[in-house]
Amino acid sequence: MPSVKIKENEPFDVALRRFKRSCEKAGILSEVRRREFYEKPTSERKRKLAAAVKRHAKKVQREQRRFERLY
C-alpha cells in the first residue's frame, strides 16, 4: 500500500497528486479493475495469450519498419 508523508507547509493537492502517482506506479487501480469480477482460468489464459500474440505482432511490425528504413 503506497503511503505519502506530508511535508511541512505542503498543500493538500500536491500530496494527493503524489499519492495518486504512487498508486499508479504500484498498479493498484489496474489490479482492482482486474479483480472486480471473477475470471475463469481458461478465460484468463485466453486473454493473456491474445495479449502475447498482439505484443509479438507489434514487435515484428516495428522491426519490419526499422529494416525498411535501412535499405
Swiss-Prot record:
**Keyword Ribosomal protein listed:** yes
Keyword Ribonucleoprotein on entry: yes
Q: Which Gene Ontology CC terms are recorded?
A: ribonucleoprotein complex; ribosome
A GO BP term here is: translation
- From the UniProt record, which GO molecular function terms apply? structural constituent of ribosome
Q: What keywords is this UniProt entry annotated with?
A: Ribonucleoprotein, Ribosomal protein
Name the domain of life. Bacteria
The entry's family comment says: Belongs to the bacterial ribosomal protein bS21 family.
Q: Which HAMAP family match?
A: Ribosomal_bS21
Q: What is this protein called?
A: Small ribosomal subunit protein bS21
Organism lineage string: Bacteria, Pseudomonadati, Pseudomonadota, Gammaproteobacteria, Oceanospirillales
